[in-house]
Amino acid sequence: MGVFLDMRTSMNSGTVGQPGLSLGPSPEAFGSIGLQTLGVPNPIITLNGTVGVTGEVGDTFVVELVRGSVYDPFYVIYRAEGTVGQNGGAEFHSFTAQDLSAPPALESVYTSFISGVSTSVRTGPEVFHGIAASN
């Protein structure tokens, strides 16, 4: 049976219409959390979140989750590509990932990033959650 260690939430935007920023080719952070993992070996980290995107039909975007606070492709633990399916309306895209190979640390930091074509806009909400447990 698993043992609960910590749970954190990062809410960049809780409403539709914000932050209203265009996507670009470089990943931009929309959430960051630090989970207290207490130096436990092999913690089980479960991450999830939602991002709202508006754009032209067929516009693509990428959500990446990184172990750490700075974007580095080496530390990407999750990558998902999405496509805008309707014109003009806000679409909500949710994701769930696990980091089953997190190193023992007092705190494990995770950051969520988004990138995409410039005709797409981050319309919110933008939330990022994490739970740490041990077995």
Range-by-range predicted roles:
Residues M1-I44, E56, H129-N135:
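Terminal (often C-terminal
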